[in-house]
């Protein structure tokens, strides 16, 4: 993520294995190009945080091979659901892990969000569990709600043995809800 305190020094690492060099840009301004030393698979910049867009451009033989960017998130606006699979077996045991993210109006992850998220699952499946990755959370695994941790949570959906659609819905007060459909076949 690219959300820190203004002026705070941040170490930015770029990992690569199919490039000769990486150039880093902050809000369109080049912060320089780095070439790996020896067998290193990363290069690093230490820069003061400035809100905006951080972009890394990898090149091999002078040609661009990859461009990756992240932007500073604004206030939490919506929930985003992303299943690891959109189709599971209708065998009563297959699972889909649905990642939940708190995002701003531009779709950027809000890394400091701690919103309480409520889940409902309808159709040919059920909520097999929830998680958020927090090592100190005392919330039960089998629950229809979970507080986001660094803007993220997880709901695990299990097929109930019948073929058909599984509709997973996530809501949180003040945020735009999200629904995703997983097919059981």
Show the residue positions of the predicted features.
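Low-complexity, acidic Ser/Thr/Pro/Gly-rich terminal tails and inter-domain linkers that flank the onset
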Residues: 73-91
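Short, solvent-exposed loop/linker segments at the N-terminal edge
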Residues: 2-8, 87-96
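Short aromatic-acidic-glycine turn motif
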Residues: 34-35, 77-81, 118-137
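Beta-strand-rich structural segments
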Residues: 12-16, 57, 82, 93-111, ...
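Edge beta-strands of extracellular beta-sandwich domains
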Residues: 62-75, 176-185
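Short, hydrophobic beta-strand segments
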Residues: 43-49, 140-161
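Extracellular Ig-like/FN3 beta-sandwich strand-entry sites
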Residues: 49-53, 93-95, 163-165
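Long hydrophobic segments that form regular secondary structure
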Residues: 1-66, 83, 103-106
């Amino acid at each position: 993520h690219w959300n820190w305190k203004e002026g705070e020094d941040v170490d930015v690492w770029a990992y690569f294995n199919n490039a000769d060099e990486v150039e880093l840009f902050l809000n369109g301004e080049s912060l320089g190009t780095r070439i790996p030393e020896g067998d290193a698979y990363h290069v690093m910049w230490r820069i003061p945080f400035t809100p905006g867009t951080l972009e890394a451009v990898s090149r091999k033989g002078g040609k661009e091979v990859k461009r990756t960017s992240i932007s500073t998130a604004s206030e939490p606006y919506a929930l985003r659901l992303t299943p690891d699979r959109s189709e599971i077996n209708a065998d009563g045991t297959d699972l889909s892990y649905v990642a939940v993210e708190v995002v701003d109006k531009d779709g950027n992850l809000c890394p400091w969000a701690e919103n309480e998220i409520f889940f409902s699952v309808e159709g040919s499946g059920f909520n097999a569990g929830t998680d958020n990755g927090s090592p100190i959370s005392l919330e039960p695994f089998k629950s229809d709600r979970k507080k986001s941790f660094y803007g993220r949570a997880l709901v695990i959906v299990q097929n109930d043995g019948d073929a058909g659609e599984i509709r997973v819905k996530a809501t949180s007060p003040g945020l735009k809800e999200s629904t995703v459909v997983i097919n059981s076949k």
